[in-house]
Amino acid sequence: MQKDIHPNYQEITATCSCGNVIKTRSTVGHDLNLDVCGACHPFYTGKQRVVDTGGRVDRFNKRFSIPVGKK
């Protein structure tokens, strides 16, 4: 490795809005504030909601479909 060309790799803390503090290493150089983390993200906590778009698609198709026997 060449000397004096690599960024400074140091320990930082990433603080989530839920209060979770994560210690990691990065070249950013300052502490980070996160909006979501693995402790509060709905996908990882199991609180994820499934949006039912089937009703909307069916309603659109029914409204804008052309009847078969009509010209």
Curated annotation (Swiss-Prot):
What GO biological process term is on the record, naming one?
translation
Annotated binding of Zn(2+), by residue: 16, 18, 37, 40
Keyword annotations for this protein, in alphabetical order, are: Metal-binding, Ribonucleoprotein, Ribosomal protein, RNA-binding, rRNA-binding, Zinc
GO CC list: ribonucleoprotein complex; ribosome
UniProt-recorded Gene Ontology molecular function terms: metal ion binding; rRNA binding; structural constituent of ribosome
Q: Which cofactor does it need?
A: Zn(2+)
Asked if the record carries the keyword rRNA-binding, the reply is yes
Which Pfam families does UniProt cross-reference here? Ribosomal_L31
Query: How and how many cofactors are bound, per the record note?
Result: Binds 1 zinc ion per subunit.
Q: Which family does it belong to?
A: Belongs to the bacterial ribosomal protein bL31 family. Type A subfamily.
**What does this protein do, in the record's words?**
Binds the 23S rRNA.
What's the protein here called? Large ribosomal subunit protein bL31
